[in-house]
Amino acid sequence: MTAVTYRTCPRTGLQFEGNAEKLMIANAFVAVVFLLIGGILAIGVVLTRWPAIHWLAADTFYQVLTAHGIDMLIFWIIFFEIAVLYFASSTLLRCRLATPNIAWLAFALMLIGAITNNVAVFQGSSSVMMTSYVPMMAAPSFYLGLILFAVGALIACFVFFGTLVVAKREKTYEGSVPLVTFGAITAAIIAVFTIASGAIILIPTFLMSVGLVKEVDPLVYRTVWWAFGHSSQQINVAAHISIWYAVAAIAFGAKPMSERVSRGAFLLYILFLQLASAHHLLADPGLSTGWKVVNTSYFMYFAVLASMIHALSVPGAMEVAQRQKGLTKGLFEWLRKAPWGNPVFSGVIIALFGFGFLGGISGVMMGTEQLNMIIHNTIYVPGHFHATVVVGTTLTFMALTYFLLPVLFRREMINPGLAKYQPYLFGLSMYFFCLVMMGAGTLGVSRRHWDMALSGAALGYEWPGAAYLMMGLVGIAGMAAIVGGGIYIYITVGSLLWGKKLDSGAVSPRFTPVPQAMPGTALQSTGSSGFVAPGSFALTMVFLAAFVLYYFINWKYLSQVWGLS
């Protein structure tokens, strides 16, 4: 058994247990590799959906789209989230990692599964999209890879829970766990439900692919699979909001406005957030109207309430901390004088606004049973989830990486001037990408069809010029975002390869108290800051007004399709 050691970061005061630190580095590094693969594949997707270029042949397009979706939505994000779980438990609670050997087994299963799945897709026999709906079948190794990955991720979640038990037993913290750790617990609980759902439905599908099971009912498959496919985004929501609170503490020394309320919002996520999966099933005939109405109204309102709480609490915490430093002029001096040149802060704040205004509002609209019919299975849907997964989650993870490069990887960032602008290029390009994609979807452009012009089809359809314009803008904005993602890869990998090695800090056989003056203190503490945040309240009211306006605009759109005379 490897001896337990703790390395104290001289820049933050955070302490990294040796085994946990190696696992964080391994999971985060592999995550970035899959982000790179998915980003390269995105070039093919974007240039094919751009009508003026229409690059790839149909077979190649669906192969590339399958790999892009799985690598980005599953492998990149979950590998990174496992690293976040280990950080939120071992580092923030200053304890040893439970069962490091089993944690390495989990990592190996995830890596083998991800590689197996990618090989199956690139061999050309598994272009079934990420959803892989039955009875359309992929190669057995496609399903086997996903199952191995799911099992590994589940094991990693239980290692995280075990680490919480270790911290409690060894009394490495007093009182409640920090809010960031509480948010990570929320993400892990949702992850167990989500990943288990994926494994439950993929196992019989795998057996069907090898001939041991005759049939998997398509409606059962869709219902259970979406408990995995969409609920994986709910893991992301809990994880990236936890990181928002972490960055507020790191950048400003901020505490949540009310820790109890923020924890209550995370609890609402556990109870209700994954029910948002229902919007994918609203056109399915096998589910009752009552089930659809309850899931898309009453239950969804609790999840929306939780998100509104975080929408006020995260910027509010930053505002309170800034006002305590004397930045009290008007509503927004605290925001104007925030560290906009720091990519850790700018990445998070761009992610926060984009996730709320683009992903959140569009998600509530899509989750309303009647309104969903306007945009169901149109390209509006990927416009929405790029606003949540790419703007909200991926940009947040990028911002956290800039913090972790010197702290966890112990490397000085190369080209900090370029890093300063990367969140703006990536984030604002994705803002525009999502907006025009949702606009094209509102006009009815198909979600996945290789050729929006339906060339050669017996029954063609002539889209309005605005639809072609918007899809062209999707291509331009998408390529700009890919450049922004490439800059992130260059800075991250380049810093690991060529960045100056930084002082590792002292190593000791046990954890030690964090000095009060260090940034890690705020990250590991508990407590509330108060409610004096008029600027954040004003921003929240603007968000609410935008939400109400857009919601009723879509009811107007819906009324226009009713005429039958």
Range-by-range predicted roles:
Residues I349, L428, A538-N554:
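Final/C-terminal transmembrane alpha-helix of multipass membrane proteins
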Residues Y550-S565:
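Juxtamembrane boundary at the C-terminal end of a transmembrane helix
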Residues Q524-L544:
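Juxtamembrane cytosolic/matrix-side boundary and N-terminal portion
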Residues M72-L73, N236, M541, F547, ...:
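Residues in flexible loops and secondary-structure boundaries
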Residues T2-M518, S536:
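Membrane-embedded and interfacial regions of multi-pass energy-transducing membrane proteins
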Residues P519-L523:
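Intrinsically disordered, low-complexity cytosolic tails and juxtamembrane linkers
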